[in-house]
Structures are given as structure tokens and as C-alpha cells.
């Protein structure tokens, strides 16, 4: 009981917490045989493959991992593996020399050892947050950013190890059913996604959790919305990536560091059917038309829906030249005359979308008959990606957002988190959609929560 309380003090999803708990559990094994047995089970339940020791192309770079896997009790106790894609040295000093011609034998050999873990059911792959897209690879010399090439090589190595583990002859192993990718780069890899390797692994996954990261710009992200990956990836995610997992998924998390779903890329989930989906977590998703959320409403099996910092866009300013390739869905937008809100730029197009959370909440209540748990909140800093159950139930004032393509560093203009006040164009012009819609939004929010509560009983 004491050991169990110790283990619950820290979140088991955080690698730093795992290492902290492990420091306390190691001496507990010395108390008696019973404590040794209990502590061992907790100690090795989650294993972390991290770059440790001297990373010089040989096995010493993964000494901790390899020593742990040499212990039979550890191999049998492991249920989850966290794989760190690169070392702190690589992130700080841009040392990527271990990856040569797409090969890093010490790392890939360490990854392959998951075949020796008969009881794991979950894999987490943690990339670094910074990444470079195609344009930066050609024009910018930043070496402290994890390259897209090594990211893909790591992803392939993990998938290959999962597949090889599943088809080992004369060996009974659990099926790896949960896949978490932290900081997956928003770069389409169609050849890999269309490969037999990808599909062989995807067919067994029933819990998929993705946090997407995007182009890192050392000089500021004010032009990042023009990078081609921001235009391409969401369509790729909808049409190629997710369909490979759709049949068996019971839980899905789609979270981006940046606002997504509306522009420059567009995601409306059209054609996506998840017949077994029970839990859906969305982070930073922006609704921009009256049918934008229909893909969620069509998942009739949903029992839990969590919206973490999701918004409805209110006012939009785009540049006709810079955004002409964007797949803008203007059908529910009202065009505003030039000069509105003090915006007189020659290429500026101004729009307003009158969508409300009142309408969205009512649709959720009426279209998801099995929904029992609904969460709606705004993150304070980082997304609740690894801890979705911490998402609250708050009708926060910043639930509406504006978009101004001419504003930096980000074109997404979030509302004041306390008052809901919004800015657009001339900063002497202000608006407050949360106040305008407060009565209707609050009524629909209460009705939705009440319906979920009744279904629990």
C-alpha cells in the first residue's frame, strides 16, 4: 500500500517523474522479499530508452537501457516503453553525426530489443519540439533542430521493431495497442504511410495519441503560416494517415502546438469513420464553418469528448496573394467592406463568421447519444496532451478567436483569458464574442453537462 501511494504521487506519463519514482523504489527493494517483488513490478512497469552515457556510435550510448533489459524481471514486468528520439547533447549542439546514411546502429539495435519484452502494450515516441521543414533545410543552417530525416528514420525503426516483435516464431507476446507520438513533425511522408510496414502496425493500434509540432523559426514564427507543410499536412492526416487506424480505434488524441483545422491547412474529418471510438481528445482545433464539427458528431459511439483550447473563429483577415493557395471554406463567412476595423491594405479580404458555441454544444448533446464525459477548458501554457483527464469543465472567456494574416508573430489572436476581449485590425477597435454569446453559450453548456450527467446514472 505504501509503495502504491508512492507510485501515485507522480504522473507515470512523464519521463522525469518515472525517474524520480525509480529513485525511491530502488531502496524499497531491500526491505524484504515481499517489498522487493512489489517494487520490482512498479519499478520496471515503464521503461525509458534514452540516450545515456557517451554517445559515440556504440552501445555505451544506451547503457542504462541495455543493462535494464538484461534483467529478466524487468523484461517481464514492462508494460510500456518510452523512446526518446535524441539526446540532450544533440538538441543543444546539433550533433547528428550518429545518423549516417539513414543508419544509427547503436540506437536501432536498442530499439529492436523491445522484441524481448513480452508484456508491453504501449509505445510512446518522444521527438524534440523543434523541427525544420523543406524550406529551412535548404536555406537555414540551424543544427540544434532535430532533422526531418532522422525523425523519419527513428519512426521507421520503431515501426519495424513493433512488427518484428509481433511475428516472432514460437513466442507469445502481447499486442502493442497504444501508440503515442509526442512532437510528430507536420511533414507528410506518403511513401511511408502507404507502406506495408505502416499498415501492419496501424491495424493493431486501438489507442492513438498525436501531438503535432511545426516548423521552427529562430527569427520568429511570423511567416511560418506560408510554409508548405502547414498547407499540406492536415489534408494528409485526414486522408492518408488516420484512415489506416480508423477501424479499431477506441481512443484518439489530435493535438497541435498551433491552432489547426481552418487555415492554412484544412481539416474537417470528411470520410473519417471510427466505429469503435469511445474517447476523442482535441487540442487547439478551430471551427470555422457550420459543418466543420460534423465529423465529430458522426462518431456515434463516443462516450468521452475533451476539447482543450478549441475555438470558434470570429473575424478573419487574409491576404489575397499570399493565401490564394489555401483551401479556404468561406461558405458561412460574411464579407466585410474594406476599411472595416481600420484595415485598408490593398490585398486584404475581411470576413466574419457568426458561429457560436451555443449551436455547437446543442449539436453535441443531440447527436452523441452515448456521451457521458464532456470536458471544455483552456490550457494555461502547455497542452494537456499526456494528461487529458486534467482538462476541466469551464466555459472560459477565450473560447472565440480571430485570425489576421498580417499580424505576427502569430496570426491567431486569442482573446483575453479573463475578460474575453478580442482585438482585430486597428487596436482601438475591440470586440467580445464571449460576452455577446454568454447567455446562449452558458445555457447550452449547462444542458450538455446535465445530459452527460443523466447518462452516467
Question: Language-model segments: what does each one mean?
Answer:
Residues 29, 33, 105-108, 118, ...:
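A structural signal for well-ordered alpha-helical segments within the folded catalytic domains
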Residues 80, 87-97, 116-124, 129-153, ...:
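Leucine-rich tandem repeat or coiled-coil scaffolds
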Residues 1-102:
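Hydrophobic regular-secondary-structure patch
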Amino acid at each position: 500500500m505504501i509503495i502504491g501511494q508512492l507510485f501515485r504521487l507522480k504522473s507515470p506519463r512523464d519521463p522525469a517523474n518515472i525517474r524520480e519514482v525509480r529513485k525511491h523504489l530502488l531502496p524499497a527493494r531491500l526491505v524484504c522479499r515481499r517489498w522487493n517483488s512489489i517494487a520490482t513490478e512498479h519499478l520496471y512497469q515503464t521503461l525509458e530508452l534514452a540516450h545515456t552515457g557517451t554517445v559515440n556510435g556504440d552501445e555505451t550510448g544506451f547503457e542504462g537501457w541495455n543493462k535494464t533489459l538484461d534483467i529478466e524481471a524487468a523484461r517481464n514486468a514492462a508494460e510500456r516503453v518510452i523512446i526518446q528520439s535524441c539526446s540532450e547533447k544533440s538538441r543543444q549542439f546539433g550533433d547528428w553525426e550518429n545518423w549516417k546514411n539513414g543508419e544509427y546502429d547503436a540506437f536501432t539495435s536498442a530499439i529492436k530489443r523491445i522484441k524481448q519484452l513480452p508484456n508491453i502494450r504501449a509505445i510512446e515516441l518522444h521527438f524534440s519540439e523543434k523541427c525544420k521543414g523543406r524550406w529551412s533545410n535548404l536555406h537555414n543552417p540551424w543544427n540544434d533542430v532535430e532533422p526531418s530525416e532522422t525523425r523519419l528514420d527513428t519512426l521507421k525503426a520503431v515501426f519495424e521493431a513493433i512488427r518484428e516483435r509481433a511475428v516472432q516464431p514460437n513466442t507469445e507476446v502481447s499486442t502493442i495497442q497504444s501508440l503515442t507520438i509526442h512532437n510528430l513533425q507536420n511533414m507528410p511522408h506518403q511513401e511511408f504511410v502507404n507502406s506495408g510496414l505502416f499498415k501492419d502496425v496501424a491495424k493493431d493500434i486501438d489507442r492513438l495519441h498525436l501531438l503535432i509540432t511545426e516548423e521552427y523559426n529562430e527569427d520568429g514564427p511570423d511567416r511560418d503560416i506560408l510554409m508548405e507543410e502547414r498547407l499540406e499536412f492536415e489534408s494528409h492526416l485526414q486522408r492518408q494517415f488516420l484512415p489506416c487506424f480508423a477501424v479499431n480505434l477506441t481512443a484518439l488524441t489530435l493535438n497541435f502546438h498551433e491552432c489547426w483545422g481552418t487555415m492554412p491547412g484544412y481539416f474537417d474529418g470528411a470520410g473519417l469513420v471510427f466505429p469503435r471510438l469511445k474517447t476523442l481528445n482535441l487540442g487547439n482545433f478551430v471551427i470555422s464553418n457550420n459543418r466543420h464539427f460534423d465529423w465529430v458528431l458522426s462518431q456515434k459511439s463516443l462516450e468521452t469528448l475533451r476539447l482543450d483550447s478549441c475555438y470558434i473563429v470570429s473575424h478573419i483577415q487574409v491576404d489575397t496573394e499570399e493565401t490564394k493557395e489555401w483551401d479556404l471554406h468561406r461558405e458561412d463567412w460574411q464579407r466585410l467592406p474594406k476599411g472595416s476595423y481600420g484595415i485598408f491594405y490593398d490585398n486584404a479580404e475581411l470576413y466574419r463568421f457568426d458561429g457560436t458555441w451555443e449551436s455547437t454544444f446543442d449539436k453535441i448533446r443531440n447527436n452523441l447519444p452515448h456521451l457521458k464525459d464532456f470536458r471544455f477548458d483552456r490550457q494555461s501554457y502547455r497542452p494537456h496532451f499526456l494528461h487529458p483527464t486534467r482538462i476541466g469543465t469551464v466555459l472560459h472567456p477565450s473560447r472565440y478567436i480571430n485570425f489576421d494574416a498580417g499580424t505576427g508573430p502569430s496570426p491567431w489572436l486569442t482573446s483575453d483569458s479573463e475578460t474575453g476581449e478580442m482585438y482585430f485590425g486597428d487596436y482601438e477597435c475591440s470586440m467580445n464574442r464571449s460576452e455577446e454569446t454568454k447567455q446562449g453559450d452558458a445555457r447550452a453548456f449547462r444542458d450538455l453537462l446535465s445530459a452527460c450527467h443523466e447518462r452516467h446514472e
